[in-house]
């Protein structure tokens, strides 16, 4: 009997090991079942609100993905981007990368309101952003992934980090890669995550220099495919019209697929920060070619890189708080 008891104990320990490794692989205290008991319907609530928002406006999927990216690159994935200005907070919404372009905050508010009805004071705004990003991918035809949860919300924001950490449309390849490296992301993550530009739009002000004054000498970017450039000039005047939108992916702007990479190979990347992935570095060029040829490979890496990005410096344990309202810290 004693031998049987010992055997069963050993067997239980062996069976338990993979569970421990699984949780550990998601990054410390973050794990998918974090709300299994405290808010088991969290995934369904987030998905329902995001689905309605994307059904009303497909562009919202890209906007929500962008919010998650811009949040994680500043102080980690802590919901700091969602904070409005107050006596204690200089909002990141006023930074150059976010001013007049970051959107989707109302959708986050709707998700949070529904969660507060069902599970008050339980689900963080940082986790809301992470789940909404995943659902935005799925709802436009992109990959799904299991989202590690358990982030807490910051009590601060950083306008300066938002201005300095987030890659700009006119940055060089090396500058962009350096900004990714500082977040613990590598060149593969850079190329895969840039693939989210397969959906969404960009403002004229973000790519005008490529059309009229790429090098400061009054000449356009000659690497831009000429018929594509001519069409863009019809939409984007030399001056004015800063808020005019153009699609980031001219093949399938509303579908999450690998056509973004096919555009880069044809020199039809809208932003300079897109096109340099193909024109400025051999390793990134090979990754662009690989993802253009194999959508499954792109989807698999995108999901992996999104999980990795979502694990950037999360607040866990007793750090931070669970905001009641994503726009302001708890009083």
Swiss-Prot record:
Family according to the record: Belongs to the peroxidase family. Classical plant (class III) peroxidase subfamily.
Active site residues per record: 70
Database matches in Pfam families: peroxidase
Cofactor list: heme b; Ca(2+)
GO cellular component assignments: extracellular region
Binding-site residues, Ca(2+) 2: 198, 249, 252, 257
Binding sites annotated in the UniProt record for heme b: 197
Predominant location category: secreted
Record: glycosylation sites: 170, 213
The protein's name in its UniProt record: Peroxidase 49
Top-level EC class: oxidoreductase
List of residues binding substrate: 167
Cofactor note: Binds 1 heme b (iron(II)-protoporphyrin IX) group per subunit. Binds 2 calcium ions per subunit.
Gene3D superfamilies for the chain: 1.10.520.10, Peroxidase, domain 2
Enzyme Commission code: 1.11.1.7
Cystines in this chain: 39-119, 72-77, 125-326, 204-236
Additional comment: There are 73 peroxidase genes in A.thaliana.
């Amino acid at each position: 009997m004693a031998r049987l008891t010992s055997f069963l104990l050993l067997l239980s320990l062996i069976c338990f090991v993979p569970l421990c490794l699984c949780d550990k692989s998601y990054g410390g205290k973050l794990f998918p079942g974090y709300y299994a008991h405290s808010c088991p319907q969290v995934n369904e609530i987030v998905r329902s609100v995001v689905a309605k928002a994307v059904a009303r406006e497909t562009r919202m999927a890209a906007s929500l993905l962008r919010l998650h990216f811009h949040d994680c690159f500043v102080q980690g994935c802590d919901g700091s981007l969602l904070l409005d200005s107050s006596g204690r907070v200089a909002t990141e919404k006023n930074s150059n990368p976010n001013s007049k372009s970051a959107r989707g905050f109302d959708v986050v508010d709707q998700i949070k309101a529904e969660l507060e009805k069902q599970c008050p004071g339980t689900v963080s705004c940082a986790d809301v952003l992470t789940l909404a990003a995943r659902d935005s991918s799925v709802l436009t035809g992109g990959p799904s992934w299991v989202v590690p949860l358990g982030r807490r919300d910051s009590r601060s924001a950083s306008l300066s980090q938002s201005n300095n950490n987030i890659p700009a449309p006119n940055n060089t390849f090396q500058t962009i890669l350096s900004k990714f490296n500082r977040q613990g992301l590598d060149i593969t993550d850079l190329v895969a995550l840039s693939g989210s530009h397969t959906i969404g739009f960009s403002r004229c002000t973000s790519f005008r220099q490529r059309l009229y004054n790429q090098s400061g000498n009054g000449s356009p970017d000659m690497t831009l495919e000429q018929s594509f450039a001519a069409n863009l000039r019809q939409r984007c005047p030399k001056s004015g019209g800063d808020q005019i939108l153009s699609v980031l992916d001219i093949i399938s702007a509303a579908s999450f697929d690998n056509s973004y990479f096919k555009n880069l190979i044809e020199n039809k990347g809208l932003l300079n920060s897109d096109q340099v992935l193909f024109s400025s570095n051999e390793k990134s060029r090979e990754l662009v070619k690989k993802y253009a040829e194999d959508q499954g490979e792109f989807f698999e890496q995108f999901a992996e890189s999104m999980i990795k990005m979502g694990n950037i410096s999360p607040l866990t344990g007793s750090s931070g708080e669970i905001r009641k309202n994503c726009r302001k810290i708890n009083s």
